[in-house]
Amino acid sequence: MIQKNWQELIKPNKVDFITNGSRTHATVVAEPLERGFGLTLGNALRRVLLSSLRGAAVTAIQIDGVLHEFSSIPGVREDVTDIVLNVKEIAIRMEGEGPKRMVVRKEGPGVVTAGDIQTVGDVEILNPDHVICTLDEGAEIRMEFTVNTGKGYVPADRNRAEDAPIGLIPVDSLYSPVRKVSYKIENTREGQVLDYDKLTLNIETNGSVSGEDAVAYAARILQDQLAIFVNFEEPQKEAPQEQVAELAFNPALLKKVDELELSVRSANCLKNDNIVYIGDLIQKTEAEMLRTPNFGRKSLNEIKEVLASMGLHLGMEIPSWPPENIEDLAKRYEDQY
């Protein structure tokens, strides 16, 4: 059936988010993935994380007494070009839409930092210790910043309005809240298969969004972009009512243990103990299994791991097991496990 193209692909059964209490750094680990899907998803998520998440940034700066960015200010150690470069690194969170204006006014001697900026409304400075410029004794500076929201990187010439007043200096705007993204692909194991992919993403943000949320937003963007390519509805498979009513246990119990891809040693031990179906196996306790000839702790752990992946475990009680027509039921339900 055509739906097996996507229904039978392995999907991650866990995604771990590791932050160690940091708002700006996160490690995301997803496994297992089909071979090759780690690279596919890692590259796609990285590109979207860096280019498509919205954020806030300074778009222009106006300094009292300065007409253009190639000026210098008496008593200020940095020239205007350096000040503009420092302003670009201010990390901002703004919930609403822009543009909005912020002001900083300070007298020397001392250092002007992002924390000296007088914010308005829902604008928050995330790196208040970031240095903008240094003032000597008797120096004074007043700057006004224009802040807006957007996505990606916008160069200064696109922030230059035609009707901008003299002295308004446009700034390159890095709106993306994600600063760095790297990923690596490693092999991981699922059951007896050793070459599935494990995807590890390392994310650094400016603090306006957590790494976990950033990945969620990027995945949602990809989901929306890909949805247009799906030109069919999901096939609905309905089990006959009489079959549902007839079966009093999980159909997976009708699967034979020789289909579990166990090691040869474990499979032979089960065969020698006349354990044919998963339903036979799960009713055995760990102690009973360890009394089986040639069956050791390694085989026990292997079987427990395989059963756990199916939501089962040893020592379960199935009152209606085994059914009288077990072979017929196994054939009837073989496409449901």
UniProtKB/Swiss-Prot annotation:
GO terms for cellular component: cytoplasm; DNA-directed RNA polymerase complex. Disulfide bonds: none annotated. It holds the Pfam family RNA_pol_A_bac. Keywords: DNA-directed RNA polymerase, Nucleotidyltransferase, Transcription, Transferase. It catalyses: RNA(n) + a ribonucleoside 5'-triphosphate = RNA(n+1) + diphosphate. CDD domains: RNAP_alpha_NTD. DNA-dependent RNA polymerase catalyzes the transcription of DNA into RNA using the four ribonucleoside triphosphates as substrates. HAMAP family: RNApol_bact_RpoA. This is DNA-directed RNA polymerase subunit alpha. The lineage of its organism: Bacteria, Pseudomonadati, Pseudomonadota, Alphaproteobacteria, Hyphomicrobiales. The gene is rpoA.
